Amino acid sequence: MIAIIDYGLGNVKNVQRAVQYLGYDAILTDKYNEIANADVVILPGVGHFKDAMQAINERGLANIITSITDKPVIGICLGMQLFYRWSAEGDVEGLNIFPGNIIPIQSPYPVPHLGWNNLISKHPLLLHDVYFVHAYQAEMSQHVVAYTEYGTKIPAIVQYQNYIGIQFHPEKSGDDGLAILNQALKGGFQDDQTMASN
């Protein structure tokens, strides 16, 4: 069973449909026990970082999200950004799973970064065009598995142990996006040969 955390922000139904299309059972939940007992946990999100952290804290979910060690935990779009220490969007602390901060995209191109862009990675699955919608980004680090170029390098997939962050929307990225989501559900992409920043 896959638990998709429903904390009041985000495209939870679209993510649920994508996961079910891949053949998995998926529930929408904000219940501690259901999250703890799931095989995989997904933290989606669309909206403002500060609002999302407030909603997570009001539901008492920060502790369970940050304490999981035995299963994949996947953050999508804003959900990925919540994994970081701090965000300039609202000047608020995140879940502090990944070191580093969420910062405004510094690009000569229009912001938000909206539409299709290609992934750059050493992983053979991560060389496709995928769909982005965001105005903030993570900093480049050793945890980046794939990135995209938009006048600057933007982390697109990050992984630290069992935590996987996906900045783009795999559920809106066609068959390639679904294949990437499926690999994340199976545990992700990280090994010594696939880190994009090496």
Curated annotation (Swiss-Prot):
Heterodimer of HisH and HisF. One of its GO terms (biological process) is L-histidine biosynthetic process. IGPS catalyzes the conversion of PRFAR and glutamine to IGP, AICAR and glutamate. The HisH subunit catalyzes the hydrolysis of glutamine to glutamate and ammonia as part of the synthesis of IGP and AICAR. The resulting ammonia molecule is channeled to the active site of HisF. This is Imidazole glycerol phosphate synthase subunit HisH. Its EC number is 4.3.2.10, 3.5.1.2. It is found in: Cytoplasm. GO terms for cellular component: cytoplasm. SUPFAM superfamilies: Class I glutamine amidotransferase-like (SSF52317). PROSITE patterns: GATASE_TYPE_1. Residues 1-194 form the Glutamine amidotransferase type-1 domain. NCBIfam families: IMP_synth_hisH. HAMAP family: HisH (MF_00278). The active site is at 77 (nucleophile), 169, 171. InterPro entries: Class_I_gatase-like, GATASE, Imidazole-glycPsynth_HisH. The lineage of its organism: Bacteria, Bacillati, Bacillota, Bacilli, Bacillales.
